[in-house]
Amino acid sequence: MALRAVWLIRHEPGTPLGGTVRFSRRYPTVEKRAKAFNGMTYVPVPEDGPFLRALLFQLRLLDDDKDFMERRDGCSRINKTSIYGLSVGGEELWPVIAFLRDSMIYASVPLVEQALSPRPPLISISGVSQGLELLLGIQDFLYSSQKNDTDLHTKLSQLPDLLLQACPLGTLLDANLQNSLNSINSVSVTQPQKQPAWKVGAYKGKAQISISITETVKCMQYGKQDIADTWQVAGTVACKCDLEGVMPAVTISLSLPTNGSPLQDIIVHPCVTSLDSAILTSSSIDTMDDSAFSGPYKFPFTPPLESFNLCHYTSQVPVPPILGSYHMKEEGVQLKVTVNFKLHESVRNNFEVCEAHIPFYNRGPITHLEYKASFGQLEVFREKSLLVWIIGQKFPKSMEISLSGTLTFGVKGHNKQPFDHICIGNTAYIKLNFRIADYTLTGCYADQHSVQVFASGKPKISAYRKLISSDYYIWNSKAPAPVTYASLLP
């Protein structure tokens, strides 16, 4: 019960082609269904040019068509139903509904939900009656209250929008196109906004906006004079806007404190409508200076229904949040380790999680351990050759902690102890895992009072921040370490 295509063709005797296609509409989704239903008997809908020639030939409307054609003009081909089969590219397109009224040819191809050979009875094809009903509805719309060709041209220009209402995706809902026109006009008066492509529906309920800023810090510390430590901060601003209306407008401002690190390499979601040029041109490739844009960073947008990432950014912070040193060396059968951590004074001393993983690859199980920790607790996983230093939620007032110890390892078993291709010999690392709530390393925050909302109802606005470590490594300074950049030495 659907249509594959619809045409309006102006019959123009005396012209080279004999007519002009004034309007056509194809429905690709219905065409895929036709291919599946018809199987080996499927014939695709042709382009407008071949269809025009085939239809005019079948209707005997070509000026030079005077010869008798048995397959078209024979007694067995007398047509009483306005249903035709068109010869296109050596194949026959059937059924084609077509009739001529006032120099305008109305044509459509209905979907047949079965094989076309042998031809099924027309009465069993529900799309035939729908196609004919739509064509008659278009005829009534075009010539009702028509005074001249200008009126006809205006109504033809309205057909694409009307068919979206009356026959969406090829399924006829209302053959009275005047009803669709009235519906469009009433919507344009009461709701001039167009539904954005990324928004598939409308929200109904309590208005609320949630803003979450998550910064991730990566770090490589070597403890060597000839190799520079590296660190990188990347941030993501996630939003969830539950607002009523088709296109509610929201503006969120990200701000920095006086000593905050400017945001760079900003990438925004497609729903953002405009941006200050200074935001787009701020790049981490450029050398930082006092003239760098430091906000506020305003993002006007029309939110989608689901949670989305409003923007991503990077930043060049002056120092890593936790400075560390790791010394590991072998003395006979023993391994001596010394670890020191210092929390930078600018970092909030309130962790959700803070722990250091100290793996010993390519060795046997830990058989003996003597250690001294100035702070926190040490967990030993002997078979995994792993130490986990649980620092806890706060550093001490001095902001410095240390761990020293001596380890002895047993005989390495087969496929039991952890193996690593890089950590050979004394090449080793500590991996720091930490998370701080209500804090960002750049100082970036979303001011709840500066959020502008243009929608019905006053929303509840919530803002969250957190800093998370990712690939935060402290390498053994007493052994070689992998680097991906040149040494500082000439």
From Swiss-Prot:
The Swiss-Prot or TrEMBL record describes its family as follows: Belongs to the adaptor complexes medium subunit family.
Top-rank taxon: Eukaryota
- Identify one Gene Ontology CC term for this UniProt entry: AP-5 adaptor complex
SUPFAM superfamilies associated with the record:
Second domain of Mu2 adaptin subunit (ap50) of ap2 adaptor (SSF49447)
Q: How does it sit in the membrane?
A: Peripheral membrane protein
GO biological process terms, alphabetically, are:
endosomal transport; protein transport; vesicle-mediated transport
Please give the chief subcellular localization of this protein.
cytoplasm
According to the record's subunit comment, the protein's assembly and interactions are: Probably part of the adaptor protein complex 5 (AP-5) a tetramer composed of AP5B1, AP5M1, AP5S1 and AP5Z1.
Where do the MHD domain residues begin and end?
Answer: 206-476
Could you tell me in which tissues this protein is expressed?
Widely expressed, including in small intestine and testis. In small intestine, highly expressed in cytoplasm of villi epithelial cells and internal glands. In testis, selectively expressed in maturing sperm cells (at protein level).
Any idea which UniProt keywords this protein has? Cytoplasm, Endosome, Lysosome, Membrane, Protein transport, Transport
Job of this protein: As part of AP-5, a probable fifth adaptor protein complex it may be involved in endosomal transport.
Q: Which organism is it from?
A: Mus musculus (Mouse)
Localization of this protein? Cytoplasm, Cytosol; Late endosome membrane; Lysosome membrane
- Designated gene of the protein: Ap5m1
Q: Which InterPro entries match?
A: AP2_Mu_C_sf, AP5M1, MHD
Its protein name is AP-5 complex subunit mu-1
Give the Gene3D superfamilies listed for this entry.
Answer: Mu homology domain, subdomain B (2.60.40.1170)
